[in-house]
């Protein structure tokens, strides 16, 4: 915080992947106390578990999975009290980039709908996003798509994804 406060930037952008979206939402919630909220201009969330994921719901039941997944596994559940739902929704311009397979079933056949292997698109949507785009990619693979990079750059510059 001290370095950022010393630099006092005019504008800050967040680009997150997966749980990084929950970290950004938590940070955004604490910014008013530091007088920074007006400086957060845009947020791009790539494959965010904004409402949690059924995959975490399944694994959080296992003691071994909780041990391997670490203390943050419960934060990724769909539990409205303790899970991803409990993080505040930012009012900054937000764009979502979501991975899908592009069919009725996604990469994880145990999930009911199209998905990136971990996240179902409806569980990523906040409701106040300015724009969203779907890319055929897995949860980790989406980071290595040149299309993802182009989308991030375009949204940070314009607040929209290219083909909107």
Features from the language model and the residues they span:
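Serine-dependent carboxylesterase/thioesterase catalytic core
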Residues: 1-91
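C-terminal catalytic-base region of ester-bond hydrolases, centering on the histidine
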Residues: 89-164
């Amino acid at each position: 915080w001290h370095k950022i406060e010393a630099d006092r930037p005019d504008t800050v952008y967040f680009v997150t992947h997966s749980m990084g979206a929950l970290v950004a939402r938590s940070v955004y919630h604490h910014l008013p106390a530091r007088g920074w909220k007006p400086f957060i201009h845009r947020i791009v969330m790539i494959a965010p578990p904004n409402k949690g994921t059924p995959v975490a719901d399944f694994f959080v039941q296992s003691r071994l999975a909780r041990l391997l997944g670490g203390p943050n596994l419960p934060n990724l559940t769909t539990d409205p009290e303790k899970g991803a739902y409990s993080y505040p929704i930012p009012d900054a311009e937000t764009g979502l980039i979501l991975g899908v397979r592009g069919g009725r079933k996604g990469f994880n056949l145990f999930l009911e709908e199209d998905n990136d292997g971990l996240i179902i698109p409806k569980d990523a949507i906040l409701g106040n996003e300015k724009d969203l785009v779907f890319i055929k990619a897995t949860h980790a693979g989406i980071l290595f798509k040149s299309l993802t990079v182009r989308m991030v750059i375009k949204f940070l510059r314009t607040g929209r994804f290219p083909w909107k």
